[in-house]
């Protein structure tokens, strides 16, 4: 619930009353209906949407930590933060035969 309210503040979504929060949650619930069961009460919808926000936050943080600790990533450390160094974009195959050749080349497994 706290993460949902913090996210609403960050996005600038007005929620002066409880009704404002429920309206926002109903919109999210409708747009992401494939994640939830059809018939849920208002408080249950709020709980489910807040849970989605919390899970997404955890997944994003885990992805960032994984990226910073991966041995193949060249990391620049600046005042206790890490970020991958920019790397050149690999060139795309120019012809179909080049693409078939590059796809047929065995690659080392990523660990």
From Swiss-Prot:
According to the record, the residues making up region (Disordered) are 84-111
* InterPro entries registered for this protein in UniProt: U62/UL91 (IPR035385)
A Pfam family of the record is U62_UL91
- Family listed: Belongs to the herpesviridae UL91 family.
Q: What is this protein called?
A: Protein UL91
Species of origin? Human cytomegalovirus (strain Merlin)
């Amino acid at each position: 619930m706290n993460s949902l309210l913090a996210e609403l503040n960050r996005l600038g979504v007005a929620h002066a009353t409880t009704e404002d929060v429920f309206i926002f949650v109903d919109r999210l619930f409708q747009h992401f209906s494939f994640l939830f069961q059809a018939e849920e009460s208002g408080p249950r919808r709020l709980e489910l949407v807040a849970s989605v926000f919390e899970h997404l936050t955890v997944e994003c943080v885990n992805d960032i930590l994984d990226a910073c600790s991966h041995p193949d990533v060249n990391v620049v450390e600046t005042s206790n933060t890490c970020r991958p160094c920019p790397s050149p974009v690999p060139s795309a195959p120019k012809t179909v035969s080049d693409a078939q050749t590059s796809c047929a080349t065995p690659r080392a497994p990523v660990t």
